[in-house]
UniProtKB/Swiss-Prot annotation:
Family note: Belongs to the GatB/GatE family. GatE subfamily.
Top-level taxon: Archaea
Lineage: Archaea, Methanobacteriati, Methanobacteriota, Methanomada group, Methanococci
Name the record gives this protein: Glutamyl-tRNA(Gln) amidotransferase subunit E
Entries under HAMAP family matching the protein: GatE (MF_00588)
Single Gene Ontology MF annotation: aminoacyl-tRNA ligase activity
Chemical reaction(s) catalysed: L-glutamyl-tRNA(Gln) + L-glutamine + ATP + H2O = L-glutaminyl-tRNA(Gln) + L-glutamate + ADP + phosphate + H(+)
Gene3D superfamilies for this protein: 1.10.10.410, GAD-like domain, GatB domain, N-terminal subdomain
GO biological process, one term: translation
Length: 631
Protein backbone atom coordinates (compact mmCIF):
# COMPACT_ATOMS: atom_id res chain seq x y z
CA UNK A 1 0.00 0.00 0.00
CA UNK A 2 1.22 3.50 -0.83
CA UNK A 3 1.48 5.76 2.20
CA UNK A 4 2.77 9.28 2.69
CA UNK A 5 5.43 8.15 5.15
CA UNK A 6 6.58 11.70 5.87
CA UNK A 7 3.05 12.71 6.84
CA UNK A 8 2.74 9.60 9.01
CA UNK A 9 5.98 10.50 10.79
CA UNK A 10 7.59 7.12 10.10
CA UNK A 11 10.83 6.50 11.97
CA UNK A 12 12.84 3.33 11.57
CA UNK A 13 16.08 2.20 13.16
CA UNK A 14 18.01 -1.00 12.50
CA UNK A 15 19.96 -3.40 14.67
CA UNK A 16 22.20 -5.62 12.55
CA UNK A 17 23.66 -8.74 14.16
CA UNK A 18 26.50 -10.29 12.15
CA UNK A 19 28.52 -13.40 13.08
CA UNK A 20 32.28 -13.08 12.66
CA UNK A 21 34.42 -15.73 10.99
CA UNK A 22 37.02 -16.00 13.76
CA UNK A 23 39.35 -18.86 14.67
CA UNK A 24 37.61 -19.41 18.01
CA UNK A 25 34.63 -18.31 20.07
CA UNK A 26 34.60 -14.99 21.89
CA UNK A 27 35.32 -16.27 25.41
CA UNK A 28 36.74 -19.78 24.92
CA UNK A 29 38.88 -21.80 22.51
CA UNK A 30 36.02 -23.82 20.99
CA UNK A 31 35.60 -23.64 17.18
CA UNK A 32 32.80 -21.53 15.70
CA UNK A 33 31.23 -24.59 14.13
CA UNK A 34 27.48 -25.16 13.80
CA UNK A 35 26.57 -28.85 13.82
CA UNK A 36 23.51 -30.88 12.90
CA UNK A 37 24.61 -34.34 14.05
CA UNK A 38 23.41 -35.99 17.27
CA UNK A 39 24.60 -34.14 20.41
CA UNK A 40 26.61 -35.97 23.05
CA UNK A 41 24.43 -34.89 25.96
CA UNK A 42 21.85 -32.52 27.44
CA UNK A 43 21.40 -30.49 30.61
CA UNK A 44 18.22 -28.89 31.98
CA UNK A 45 17.81 -25.53 33.69
CA UNK A 46 15.08 -23.23 35.01
CA UNK A 47 15.83 -19.50 34.98
CA UNK A 48 14.25 -17.26 37.62
CA UNK A 49 14.10 -13.44 37.77
CA UNK A 50 15.78 -11.63 40.63
CA UNK A 51 15.72 -8.06 41.88
CA UNK A 52 18.29 -5.57 40.68
CA UNK A 53 20.41 -3.50 43.05
CA UNK A 54 17.63 -0.88 42.87
CA UNK A 55 15.03 -3.39 43.97
CA UNK A 56 13.38 -3.69 40.54
CA UNK A 57 12.49 -6.82 38.59
CA UNK A 58 12.61 -6.49 34.79
CA UNK A 59 9.04 -6.83 33.47
CA UNK A 60 10.09 -8.93 30.47
CA UNK A 61 12.03 -11.31 32.76
CA UNK A 62 9.09 -11.56 35.15
CA UNK A 63 6.72 -12.29 32.29
CA UNK A 64 9.01 -15.01 30.93
CA UNK A 65 9.17 -16.72 34.34
CA UNK A 66 5.36 -16.91 34.47
CA UNK A 67 5.44 -19.28 31.50
CA UNK A 68 6.98 -21.87 33.87
CA UNK A 69 9.20 -23.25 31.13
CA UNK A 70 12.30 -25.36 31.56
CA UNK A 71 15.27 -25.02 29.22
CA UNK A 72 17.14 -27.97 27.75
CA UNK A 73 20.67 -27.44 26.38
CA UNK A 74 22.36 -29.86 23.98
CA UNK A 75 26.17 -30.00 23.90
CA UNK A 76 29.10 -31.74 22.15
CA UNK A 77 32.14 -33.07 23.99
CA UNK A 78 34.60 -32.13 21.22
CA UNK A 79 33.39 -28.69 20.03
CA UNK A 80 31.76 -27.15 23.12
CA UNK A 81 33.04 -26.76 26.67
CA UNK A 82 32.11 -25.78 30.23
CA UNK A 83 32.25 -22.06 29.37
CA UNK A 84 29.16 -22.43 27.17
CA UNK A 85 27.42 -24.42 29.91
CA UNK A 86 28.20 -21.65 32.44
CA UNK A 87 30.25 -24.03 34.59
CA UNK A 88 33.62 -22.38 33.90
CA UNK A 89 34.58 -18.67 33.91
CA UNK A 90 35.00 -17.01 30.49
CA UNK A 91 38.51 -16.77 29.00
CA UNK A 92 40.05 -13.59 27.56
CA UNK A 93 38.32 -12.00 24.58
CA UNK A 94 39.31 -13.35 21.12
CA UNK A 95 41.74 -10.68 19.78
CA UNK A 96 40.80 -11.10 16.09
CA UNK A 97 37.15 -10.39 16.98
CA UNK A 98 38.17 -7.09 18.60
CA UNK A 99 40.25 -6.17 15.52
CA UNK A 100 37.31 -6.82 13.20
CA UNK A 101 35.02 -4.71 15.39
CA UNK A 102 37.51 -1.83 15.17
CA UNK A 103 37.86 -2.27 11.40
CA UNK A 104 34.09 -2.12 10.82
CA UNK A 105 33.85 0.86 13.18
CA UNK A 106 36.47 2.69 11.10
CA UNK A 107 34.61 1.93 7.86
CA UNK A 108 31.48 3.45 9.40
CA UNK A 109 33.25 6.64 10.56
CA UNK A 110 32.75 5.91 14.26
CA UNK A 111 34.39 7.23 17.43
CA UNK A 112 36.22 4.47 19.30
CA UNK A 113 36.10 3.83 23.03
CA UNK A 114 39.48 4.25 24.77
CA UNK A 115 38.73 1.25 26.93
CA UNK A 116 36.30 -1.59 26.25
CA UNK A 117 34.37 -2.81 29.29
CA UNK A 118 32.72 -6.21 29.06
CA UNK A 119 29.12 -6.06 30.29
CA UNK A 120 26.37 -8.53 31.11
CA UNK A 121 23.03 -7.95 29.36
CA UNK A 122 20.03 -9.78 30.77
CA UNK A 123 18.59 -12.47 28.50
CA UNK A 124 15.19 -13.79 29.52
CA UNK A 125 14.23 -16.38 26.89
CA UNK A 126 16.70 -19.10 27.91
CA UNK A 127 18.89 -18.59 24.84
CA UNK A 128 21.93 -18.12 27.08
CA UNK A 129 22.75 -20.67 29.78
CA UNK A 130 23.79 -17.96 32.25
CA UNK A 131 20.69 -15.79 31.89
CA UNK A 132 22.77 -12.97 30.44
CA UNK A 133 24.75 -12.18 27.31
CA UNK A 134 28.27 -10.77 27.44
CA UNK A 135 28.60 -7.66 25.31
CA UNK A 136 31.06 -4.80 24.96
CA UNK A 137 30.63 -1.27 23.67
CA UNK A 138 33.31 -0.57 21.03
CA UNK A 139 32.34 2.63 19.19
CA UNK A 140 29.63 5.27 18.70
CA UNK A 141 28.43 8.28 16.65
CA UNK A 142 29.21 7.15 13.11
CA UNK A 143 27.35 7.20 9.81
CA UNK A 144 26.91 5.29 6.57
CA UNK A 145 26.38 6.82 3.14
CA UNK A 146 23.36 5.71 1.09
CA UNK A 147 21.56 6.95 -2.02
CA UNK A 148 18.97 8.47 0.34
CA UNK A 149 21.60 10.41 2.30
CA UNK A 150 23.65 9.69 5.40
CA UNK A 151 22.17 7.50 8.16
CA UNK A 152 23.58 7.81 11.65
CA UNK A 153 25.09 4.79 13.37
CA UNK A 154 24.48 4.99 17.11
CA UNK A 155 26.80 2.26 18.34
CA UNK A 156 28.74 -0.87 17.52
CA UNK A 157 29.01 -3.61 20.13
CA UNK A 158 30.92 -6.89 20.11
CA UNK A 159 28.99 -9.67 21.80
CA UNK A 160 28.50 -13.42 22.00
CA UNK A 161 25.80 -15.05 19.91
CA UNK A 162 22.99 -16.94 21.62
CA UNK A 163 22.19 -20.65 21.61
CA UNK A 164 20.58 -22.20 18.55
CA UNK A 165 16.91 -23.02 19.11
CA UNK A 166 16.10 -26.65 18.33
CA UNK A 167 12.53 -27.09 19.53
CA UNK A 168 9.83 -25.05 21.24
CA UNK A 169 7.38 -27.14 23.29
CA UNK A 170 4.47 -26.01 25.45
CA UNK A 171 6.43 -26.25 28.72
CA UNK A 172 10.03 -26.36 27.50
CA UNK A 173 12.44 -24.90 24.96
CA UNK A 174 15.37 -26.93 23.63
CA UNK A 175 18.59 -25.22 22.54
CA UNK A 176 22.03 -26.29 21.30
CA UNK A 177 25.09 -24.47 22.68
CA UNK A 178 27.17 -24.87 19.49
CA UNK A 179 26.21 -21.33 18.40
CA UNK A 180 26.56 -19.82 21.88
CA UNK A 181 29.71 -17.70 22.09
CA UNK A 182 30.31 -17.15 18.36
CA UNK A 183 31.51 -13.52 18.08
CA UNK A 184 28.77 -11.21 16.89
CA UNK A 185 28.73 -7.55 15.90
CA UNK A 186 25.64 -5.57 16.89
CA UNK A 187 25.33 -2.39 14.82
CA UNK A 188 22.56 0.03 15.82
CA UNK A 189 21.46 2.91 13.61
CA UNK A 190 19.73 6.14 14.53
CA UNK A 191 15.98 6.29 13.68
CA UNK A 192 16.90 8.30 10.56
CA UNK A 193 15.16 5.92 8.17
CA UNK A 194 11.91 7.41 6.86
CA UNK A 195 10.64 4.93 4.25
CA UNK A 196 10.62 1.13 3.70
CA UNK A 197 12.94 1.43 0.67
CA UNK A 198 15.39 3.48 2.72
CA UNK A 199 15.32 0.78 5.40
CA UNK A 200 16.24 -1.91 2.90
CA UNK A 201 19.01 0.26 1.41
CA UNK A 202 20.50 0.98 4.86
CA UNK A 203 20.60 -2.73 5.72
CA UNK A 204 22.13 -3.54 2.31
CA UNK A 205 24.85 -0.92 2.78
CA UNK A 206 25.79 -2.17 6.25
CA UNK A 207 25.91 -5.72 4.88
CA UNK A 208 28.18 -4.54 2.07
CA UNK A 209 30.61 -2.98 4.55
CA UNK A 210 30.63 -6.13 6.68
CA UNK A 211 31.32 -8.41 3.70
CA UNK A 212 34.08 -6.10 2.45
CA UNK A 213 36.19 -7.07 5.48
CA UNK A 214 36.19 -10.72 4.43
CA UNK A 215 35.95 -11.58 8.14
CA UNK A 216 32.26 -12.34 8.56
CA UNK A 217 30.36 -15.58 8.21
CA UNK A 218 28.06 -16.09 5.22
CA UNK A 219 24.86 -18.06 4.79
CA UNK A 220 21.42 -18.35 6.38
CA UNK A 221 21.34 -17.40 10.05
CA UNK A 222 24.74 -15.66 10.10
CA UNK A 223 23.20 -12.18 9.83
CA UNK A 224 19.97 -11.11 11.52
CA UNK A 225 18.22 -7.76 11.39
CA UNK A 226 15.99 -6.30 14.10
CA UNK A 227 13.84 -3.39 12.94
CA UNK A 228 12.48 -0.69 15.27
CA UNK A 229 9.41 0.99 13.75
CA UNK A 230 7.14 3.81 14.90
CA UNK A 231 4.71 6.34 13.43
CA UNK A 232 3.17 9.51 14.85
CA UNK A 233 0.40 8.58 17.35
CA UNK A 234 1.70 5.02 17.24
CA UNK A 235 4.25 3.14 19.34
CA UNK A 236 7.79 1.83 19.04
CA UNK A 237 7.70 -1.78 17.91
CA UNK A 238 10.84 -3.90 17.82
CA UNK A 239 10.66 -6.62 15.15
CA UNK A 240 13.15 -9.41 15.89
CA UNK A 241 14.89 -11.83 13.58
CA UNK A 242 14.49 -10.57 10.01
CA UNK A 243 16.92 -12.84 8.13
CA UNK A 244 16.05 -11.89 4.56
CA UNK A 245 17.13 -8.45 3.34
CA UNK A 246 14.26 -8.36 0.84
CA UNK A 247 11.77 -8.80 3.70
CA UNK A 248 12.72 -5.56 5.50
CA UNK A 249 10.71 -3.35 3.14
CA UNK A 250 7.58 -5.47 3.56
CA UNK A 251 7.99 -5.73 7.35
CA UNK A 252 8.04 -1.93 7.62
CA UNK A 253 5.06 -1.50 5.26
CA UNK A 254 2.98 -4.09 7.14
CA UNK A 255 3.82 -2.64 10.56
CA UNK A 256 2.70 0.80 9.38
CA UNK A 257 -0.55 -0.80 8.16
CA UNK A 258 -0.94 -2.53 11.53
CA UNK A 259 -0.49 0.65 13.56
CA UNK A 260 -2.87 2.65 11.34
CA UNK A 261 -5.48 -0.15 11.62
CA UNK A 262 -5.13 -0.42 15.41
CA UNK A 263 -5.61 3.34 15.75
CA UNK A 264 -8.76 3.14 13.62
CA UNK A 265 -10.07 0.29 15.81
CA UNK A 266 -9.33 2.33 18.95
CA UNK A 267 -11.35 5.28 17.63
CA UNK A 268 -14.29 3.03 16.76
CA UNK A 269 -14.23 1.34 20.19
CA UNK A 270 -14.18 4.71 21.94
CA UNK A 271 -17.19 5.85 19.87
CA UNK A 272 -19.04 2.73 21.01
CA UNK A 273 -18.10 3.25 24.67
CA UNK A 274 -16.63 -0.24 24.58
CA UNK A 275 -15.81 -1.99 27.84
CA UNK A 276 -13.78 -5.05 28.79
CA UNK A 277 -15.47 -7.10 31.54
CA UNK A 278 -12.81 -8.52 33.88
CA UNK A 279 -14.88 -11.53 34.96
CA UNK A 280 -13.86 -14.91 33.54
CA UNK A 281 -16.86 -17.26 33.38
CA UNK A 282 -16.76 -21.06 33.38
CA UNK A 283 -18.85 -22.36 30.45
CA UNK A 284 -17.69 -25.99 30.62
CA UNK A 285 -21.13 -27.26 31.60
CA UNK A 286 -22.80 -25.13 28.93
CA UNK A 287 -20.76 -26.71 26.10
CA UNK A 288 -20.12 -30.18 27.57
CA UNK A 289 -22.03 -31.91 24.72
CA UNK A 290 -20.39 -29.95 21.89
CA UNK A 291 -19.24 -31.72 18.74
CA UNK A 292 -16.35 -29.26 18.22
CA UNK A 293 -13.18 -31.36 18.00
CA UNK A 294 -11.05 -28.71 19.71
CA UNK A 295 -13.42 -28.29 22.65
CA UNK A 296 -14.05 -32.06 22.97
CA UNK A 297 -10.30 -32.73 23.02
CA UNK A 298 -9.78 -30.20 25.83
CA UNK A 299 -12.61 -31.69 27.90
CA UNK A 300 -11.34 -35.23 27.30
CA UNK A 301 -7.96 -34.15 28.73
CA UNK A 302 -9.68 -32.83 31.90
CA UNK A 303 -9.59 -29.26 30.69
CA UNK A 304 -12.11 -26.47 31.09
CA UNK A 305 -13.84 -23.98 28.79
CA UNK A 306 -13.99 -20.39 29.96
CA UNK A 307 -15.09 -17.14 28.40
CA UNK A 308 -14.94 -13.35 28.72
CA UNK A 309 -17.29 -10.61 27.54
CA UNK A 310 -16.06 -7.64 25.50
CA UNK A 311 -18.77 -4.98 25.30
CA UNK A 312 -18.87 -3.02 22.05
CA UNK A 313 -16.31 -5.29 20.33
CA UNK A 314 -18.67 -6.98 17.84
CA UNK A 315 -17.13 -6.87 14.35
CA UNK A 316 -13.90 -5.41 15.69
CA UNK A 317 -12.20 -8.69 16.63
CA UNK A 318 -12.51 -9.87 13.03
CA UNK A 319 -11.17 -6.57 11.63
CA UNK A 320 -7.95 -7.02 9.60
CA UNK A 321 -4.86 -5.23 10.95
CA UNK A 322 -2.24 -6.79 8.66
CA UNK A 323 -2.68 -8.88 5.50
CA UNK A 324 -4.38 -12.09 6.71
CA UNK A 325 -4.17 -11.10 10.42
CA UNK A 326 -6.91 -9.58 12.55
CA UNK A 327 -7.39 -8.00 15.96
CA UNK A 328 -8.42 -11.49 17.06
CA UNK A 329 -4.99 -12.73 15.95
CA UNK A 330 -3.40 -10.13 18.25
CA UNK A 331 -5.53 -11.45 21.13
CA UNK A 332 -4.70 -15.05 20.21
CA UNK A 333 -0.94 -14.30 20.10
CA UNK A 334 -1.08 -13.01 23.68
CA UNK A 335 -3.00 -16.06 24.83
CA UNK A 336 -0.59 -18.43 23.12
CA UNK A 337 2.58 -16.75 24.38
CA UNK A 338 1.47 -15.95 27.95
CA UNK A 339 -0.96 -18.80 28.55
CA UNK A 340 0.54 -21.57 26.48
CA UNK A 341 -2.83 -22.36 24.86
CA UNK A 342 -3.27 -23.39 21.24
CA UNK A 343 -5.59 -20.52 20.36
CA UNK A 344 -9.02 -19.03 21.03
CA UNK A 345 -12.50 -18.66 19.54
CA UNK A 346 -14.49 -15.42 19.27
CA UNK A 347 -18.08 -14.75 18.25
CA UNK A 348 -17.04 -12.66 15.23
CA UNK A 349 -16.04 -15.94 13.56
CA UNK A 350 -18.74 -18.28 14.97
CA UNK A 351 -20.56 -20.51 14.19
CA UNK A 352 -17.54 -22.40 12.86
CA UNK A 353 -14.99 -25.07 13.87
CA UNK A 354 -17.77 -27.47 14.90
CA UNK A 355 -19.47 -24.95 17.19
CA UNK A 356 -23.12 -24.71 16.09
CA UNK A 357 -25.37 -21.67 15.77
CA UNK A 358 -27.51 -23.04 18.61
CA UNK A 359 -24.44 -23.24 20.88
CA UNK A 360 -23.46 -19.67 19.95
CA UNK A 361 -26.96 -18.45 20.86
CA UNK A 362 -26.80 -20.25 24.23
CA UNK A 363 -23.32 -18.83 24.84
CA UNK A 364 -24.40 -15.25 24.11
CA UNK A 365 -27.43 -15.59 26.39
CA UNK A 366 -25.33 -17.00 29.22
CA UNK A 367 -22.72 -14.22 28.86
CA UNK A 368 -25.39 -11.46 28.56
CA UNK A 369 -23.86 -10.60 25.18
CA UNK A 370 -25.63 -7.73 23.41
CA UNK A 371 -25.83 -7.05 19.68
CA UNK A 372 -22.63 -4.95 19.68
CA UNK A 373 -20.76 -7.21 22.11
CA UNK A 374 -18.40 -10.14 21.56
CA UNK A 375 -17.38 -13.21 23.52
CA UNK A 376 -13.97 -14.89 23.56
CA UNK A 377 -13.62 -18.48 24.76
CA UNK A 378 -10.60 -20.67 25.44
CA UNK A 379 -10.40 -24.41 26.17
CA UNK A 380 -7.40 -26.06 27.85
CA UNK A 381 -6.03 -26.87 31.31
CA UNK A 382 -7.50 -24.58 33.98
CA UNK A 383 -4.28 -22.70 34.82
CA UNK A 384 -3.45 -22.14 31.13
CA UNK A 385 -6.95 -20.89 30.36
CA UNK A 386 -6.82 -18.44 33.27
CA UNK A 387 -3.43 -17.08 32.17
CA UNK A 388 -4.49 -16.84 28.55
CA UNK A 389 -7.78 -15.03 29.20
CA UNK A 390 -6.14 -12.60 31.63
CA UNK A 391 -3.62 -11.82 28.89
CA UNK A 392 -6.46 -11.29 26.38
CA UNK A 393 -8.28 -9.00 28.85
CA UNK A 394 -5.13 -6.89 29.16
CA UNK A 395 -4.66 -6.75 25.36
CA UNK A 396 -8.32 -5.87 24.80
CA UNK A 397 -8.01 -2.97 27.25
CA UNK A 398 -4.88 -1.80 25.42
CA UNK A 399 -6.82 -1.74 22.15
CA UNK A 400 -8.94 1.09 23.59
CA UNK A 401 -5.89 3.07 24.71
CA UNK A 402 -3.65 2.81 21.66
CA UNK A 403 -0.83 0.61 20.44
CA UNK A 404 1.21 -1.24 23.08
CA UNK A 405 5.01 -1.14 22.81
CA UNK A 406 6.09 -4.68 22.04
CA UNK A 407 8.84 -6.92 20.81
CA UNK A 408 7.43 -8.87 17.87
CA UNK A 409 8.70 -11.79 15.79
CA UNK A 410 9.23 -11.45 12.04
CA UNK A 411 7.17 -13.92 10.00
CA UNK A 412 8.09 -15.22 6.55
CA UNK A 413 5.17 -13.41 4.89
CA UNK A 414 6.29 -9.97 6.09
CA UNK A 415 3.87 -9.84 9.03
CA UNK A 416 4.79 -10.01 12.72
CA UNK A 417 3.48 -11.77 15.83
CA UNK A 418 3.70 -10.95 19.54
CA UNK A 419 6.85 -12.11 21.31
CA UNK A 420 7.09 -10.16 24.59
CA UNK A 421 6.86 -6.62 26.01
CA UNK A 422 9.70 -4.25 25.23
CA UNK A 423 12.34 -4.99 27.89
CA UNK A 424 13.35 -2.49 30.55
CA UNK A 425 16.22 -0.12 29.82
CA UNK A 426 18.49 -1.06 32.74
CA UNK A 427 19.56 -4.57 31.82
CA UNK A 428 23.35 -4.06 31.71
CA UNK A 429 25.78 -4.98 34.47
CA UNK A 430 29.61 -5.00 34.52
CA UNK A 431 31.26 -8.36 33.81
CA UNK A 432 33.52 -9.25 36.75
CA UNK A 433 35.30 -12.26 35.22
CA UNK A 434 36.98 -10.65 32.19
CA UNK A 435 39.41 -7.67 32.29
CA UNK A 436 38.81 -4.52 30.26
CA UNK A 437 40.56 -4.01 26.89
CA UNK A 438 42.60 -0.88 26.21
CA UNK A 439 42.35 0.48 22.65
CA UNK A 440 45.65 2.19 21.81
CA UNK A 441 46.30 4.75 19.08
CA UNK A 442 48.91 2.36 17.64
CA UNK A 443 46.24 -0.32 17.29
CA UNK A 444 43.85 2.09 15.54
CA UNK A 445 46.60 3.33 13.21
CA UNK A 446 47.39 -0.25 12.20
CA UNK A 447 43.68 -0.82 11.46
CA UNK A 448 43.42 2.39 9.40
CA UNK A 449 46.48 1.42 7.34
CA UNK A 450 44.98 -1.96 6.38
CA UNK A 451 41.39 -1.17 5.47
CA UNK A 452 39.82 -3.41 2.82
CA UNK A 453 38.90 -2.34 -0.69
CA UNK A 454 35.25 -1.27 -0.73
CA UNK A 455 32.85 -3.05 -3.12
CA UNK A 456 32.28 -0.02 -5.36
CA UNK A 457 36.06 0.26 -5.87
CA UNK A 458 36.35 -3.47 -6.47
CA UNK A 459 33.55 -3.34 -9.06
CA UNK A 460 35.43 -0.80 -11.20
CA UNK A 461 38.62 -2.85 -10.92
CA UNK A 462 36.93 -6.15 -11.84
CA UNK A 463 35.44 -4.65 -15.01
CA UNK A 464 38.80 -3.17 -16.01
CA UNK A 465 41.27 -5.81 -14.82
CA UNK A 466 39.30 -9.02 -15.45
CA UNK A 467 37.10 -7.74 -18.31
CA UNK A 468 33.90 -8.91 -16.62
CA UNK A 469 30.66 -7.33 -17.75
CA UNK A 470 29.10 -5.05 -15.12
CA UNK A 471 26.34 -7.47 -14.07
CA UNK A 472 28.76 -10.36 -13.54
CA UNK A 473 31.22 -8.04 -11.79
CA UNK A 474 28.47 -6.92 -9.37
CA UNK A 475 27.61 -10.53 -8.58
CA UNK A 476 31.26 -11.40 -8.06
CA UNK A 477 31.97 -8.42 -5.80
CA UNK A 478 29.15 -9.49 -3.45
CA UNK A 479 29.95 -13.19 -3.74
CA UNK A 480 31.16 -15.48 -0.98
CA UNK A 481 33.72 -16.68 -3.55
CA UNK A 482 35.22 -13.27 -4.35
CA UNK A 483 38.66 -14.04 -2.86
CA UNK A 484 38.75 -17.45 -4.54
CA UNK A 485 37.86 -15.81 -7.87
CA UNK A 486 40.81 -13.43 -7.63
CA UNK A 487 43.17 -16.20 -6.55
CA UNK A 488 42.16 -18.53 -9.41
CA UNK A 489 42.20 -15.76 -12.02
CA UNK A 490 45.75 -14.77 -11.11
CA UNK A 491 47.00 -18.33 -10.75
CA UNK A 492 45.51 -19.66 -13.99
CA UNK A 493 45.86 -16.75 -16.41
CA UNK A 494 45.30 -19.10 -19.36
CA UNK A 495 41.61 -19.37 -18.34
CA UNK A 496 39.33 -16.41 -18.99
CA UNK A 497 38.20 -14.79 -15.70
CA UNK A 498 34.66 -14.68 -17.11
CA UNK A 499 34.57 -18.50 -17.14
CA UNK A 500 35.83 -18.67 -13.54
CA UNK A 501 33.29 -16.07 -12.37
CA UNK A 502 30.40 -17.73 -14.23
CA UNK A 503 31.32 -21.11 -12.76
CA UNK A 504 31.45 -19.76 -9.20
CA UNK A 505 28.27 -17.69 -9.48
CA UNK A 506 25.99 -19.41 -12.01
CA UNK A 507 27.13 -23.02 -12.43
CA UNK A 508 27.22 -23.77 -8.69
CA UNK A 509 23.69 -22.36 -8.26
CA UNK A 510 22.41 -24.46 -11.16
CA UNK A 511 23.97 -27.59 -9.65
CA UNK A 512 22.37 -26.78 -6.28
CA UNK A 513 18.97 -26.38 -7.96
CA UNK A 514 19.41 -29.91 -9.32
CA UNK A 515 19.41 -31.14 -5.72
CA UNK A 516 23.14 -31.69 -5.19
CA UNK A 517 24.73 -30.49 -1.94
CA UNK A 518 27.27 -27.86 -3.04
CA UNK A 519 28.35 -27.48 0.60
CA UNK A 520 30.37 -30.68 0.06
CA UNK A 521 32.48 -28.80 -2.48
CA UNK A 522 35.71 -27.35 -1.08
CA UNK A 523 37.99 -24.65 -2.46
CA UNK A 524 40.52 -27.41 -3.06
CA UNK A 525 38.03 -29.17 -5.36
CA UNK A 526 37.47 -25.99 -7.37
CA UNK A 527 41.22 -25.40 -7.51
CA UNK A 528 41.64 -28.88 -9.02
CA UNK A 529 38.95 -28.17 -11.63
CA UNK A 530 40.63 -25.02 -12.95
CA UNK A 531 44.12 -26.48 -12.65
CA UNK A 532 43.00 -29.40 -14.82
CA UNK A 533 41.41 -27.01 -17.28
CA UNK A 534 44.60 -24.96 -17.58
CA UNK A 535 46.62 -28.15 -18.15
CA UNK A 536 44.23 -29.28 -20.94
CA UNK A 537 43.18 -32.36 -18.97
CA UNK A 538 39.56 -31.49 -19.70
CA UNK A 539 37.45 -29.07 -21.71
CA UNK A 540 35.49 -26.12 -20.32
CA UNK A 541 32.26 -27.95 -21.28
CA UNK A 542 33.26 -30.66 -18.78
CA UNK A 543 33.39 -28.25 -15.82
CA UNK A 544 29.77 -28.72 -14.57
CA UNK A 545 29.97 -32.53 -14.73
CA UNK A 546 33.38 -32.61 -13.06
CA UNK A 547 32.07 -30.40 -10.22
CA UNK A 548 29.13 -32.80 -9.81
CA UNK A 549 31.66 -35.62 -9.73
CA UNK A 550 33.51 -34.01 -6.81
CA UNK A 551 30.22 -33.55 -4.92
CA UNK A 552 29.34 -37.21 -5.49
CA UNK A 553 32.91 -38.39 -4.70
CA UNK A 554 34.51 -35.77 -2.40
CA UNK A 555 37.59 -37.89 -1.63
CA UNK A 556 38.52 -38.60 -5.28
CA UNK A 557 41.18 -36.74 -7.28
CA UNK A 558 40.56 -35.01 -10.62
CA UNK A 559 41.97 -37.82 -12.76
CA UNK A 560 39.66 -40.30 -11.00
CA UNK A 561 36.64 -38.02 -11.50
CA UNK A 562 37.44 -37.65 -15.21
CA UNK A 563 37.72 -41.43 -15.49
CA UNK A 564 34.40 -41.98 -13.66
CA UNK A 565 32.64 -39.40 -15.84
CA UNK A 566 34.28 -40.64 -19.04
CA UNK A 567 35.68 -37.19 -19.71
CA UNK A 568 39.38 -37.75 -20.08
CA UNK A 569 40.71 -35.23 -22.59
CA UNK A 570 41.23 -36.42 -26.18
CA UNK A 571 44.09 -35.60 -28.49
CA UNK A 572 43.46 -33.55 -31.66
CA UNK A 573 43.99 -36.70 -33.73
CA UNK A 574 41.32 -38.60 -31.74
CA UNK A 575 38.86 -35.73 -32.15
CA UNK A 576 39.49 -35.56 -35.92
CA UNK A 577 38.97 -39.31 -36.26
CA UNK A 578 35.61 -39.26 -34.42
CA UNK A 579 34.39 -36.26 -36.45
CA UNK A 580 35.34 -37.97 -39.72
CA UNK A 581 33.37 -41.07 -38.63
CA UNK A 582 30.30 -38.93 -37.81
CA UNK A 583 30.46 -37.20 -41.23
CA UNK A 584 30.74 -40.56 -43.00
CA UNK A 585 27.79 -41.95 -41.00
CA UNK A 586 25.68 -39.01 -42.22
CA UNK A 587 27.08 -38.75 -45.75
CA UNK A 588 23.62 -38.77 -47.38
CA UNK A 589 22.65 -35.64 -45.44
CA UNK A 590 26.00 -34.03 -46.28
CA UNK A 591 25.52 -34.72 -49.99
CA UNK A 592 22.01 -33.25 -49.85
CA UNK A 593 22.63 -30.16 -47.68
CA UNK A 594 26.33 -29.47 -48.00
CA UNK A 595 27.46 -26.95 -45.37
CA UNK A 596 23.79 -26.75 -44.30
CA UNK A 597 24.35 -30.05 -42.47
CA UNK A 598 26.64 -28.25 -40.01
CA UNK A 599 23.98 -27.84 -37.28
CA UNK A 600 22.91 -31.48 -37.31
CA UNK A 601 26.50 -32.75 -37.37
CA UNK A 602 27.58 -30.38 -34.58
CA UNK A 603 24.85 -31.76 -32.33
CA UNK A 604 25.98 -35.32 -32.99
CA UNK A 605 29.64 -34.43 -32.46
CA UNK A 606 28.88 -32.77 -29.11
CA UNK A 607 26.85 -35.79 -28.01
CA UNK A 608 30.02 -37.89 -28.29
CA UNK A 609 32.70 -35.33 -27.48
CA UNK A 610 31.16 -33.01 -24.85
CA UNK A 611 33.55 -32.74 -21.94
CA UNK A 612 36.31 -34.56 -23.82
CA UNK A 613 37.33 -31.72 -26.12
CA UNK A 614 36.90 -27.97 -26.23
CA UNK A 615 33.74 -26.86 -28.06
CA UNK A 616 35.67 -24.40 -30.23
CA UNK A 617 38.09 -27.10 -31.36
CA UNK A 618 35.16 -29.40 -32.20
CA UNK A 619 33.46 -26.64 -34.19
CA UNK A 620 36.61 -25.63 -36.09
CA UNK A 621 37.54 -29.24 -36.88
CA UNK A 622 34.02 -30.09 -38.06
CA UNK A 623 33.90 -27.04 -40.37
CA UNK A 624 37.26 -27.96 -41.85
CA UNK A 625 36.38 -31.64 -42.41
CA UNK A 626 32.90 -30.82 -43.77
CA UNK A 627 34.33 -28.33 -46.30
CA UNK A 628 36.75 -31.00 -47.49
CA UNK A 629 33.83 -33.42 -48.10
CA UNK A 630 31.61 -30.82 -49.80
CA UNK A 631 34.39 -29.69 -52.15
Amino acid sequence: MDYDYEKLGLKVGLEIHQQLNTKRKLFCNCPTKIRDDEPHGEIERVLRPSQSEMGHVDKAALLESKKEKKFIYQYYNDTTCLVELDDEPPHDVAPDAVDTALEVSTLMNMKMADEVQIMRKMVIDGSNTSGFQRTMFVSQEGFIETEYGNIGVTSLCLEEDACKKIEDGKDYTKYCVDRLGIPLLEITTEPDITSPKMGKEAARRIGTILRATGKVKRGLGTIRQDVNISIRNGARIEVKGVQNLDLIEKIIENEVTRQISLNEIKEELLKRNAEVVDEIKDITELLKDTESKVLKSALKNKGVIRAILLKGFSGMIGREVQPGRRLGTEFSDRGKVLGGVGGLFHTDELPKYGITEEEVTKLKEYMNCGENDAVILVADKKNKVERALNAVIERAKESMIGIPEETRKALDDGNTSYLRPLPGAARMYPETDVPTITITEEKLEAIRNNLPEMPEEKLVRFVKEYELNEDLAKQMVMSYHVDLFESLSKKYSKIKPTLIATTLEATLKEIKREGLDTDLLTEEHLEEVFKGLSEDKMSKEAVPEVIKGFIENPTKKLDEILEIKGMTSMSVEEVESIIEDIINQNIATVNEKGMGAMGLLMGRCMAQLRGKADGKIINTTLQKKLKEKVQ
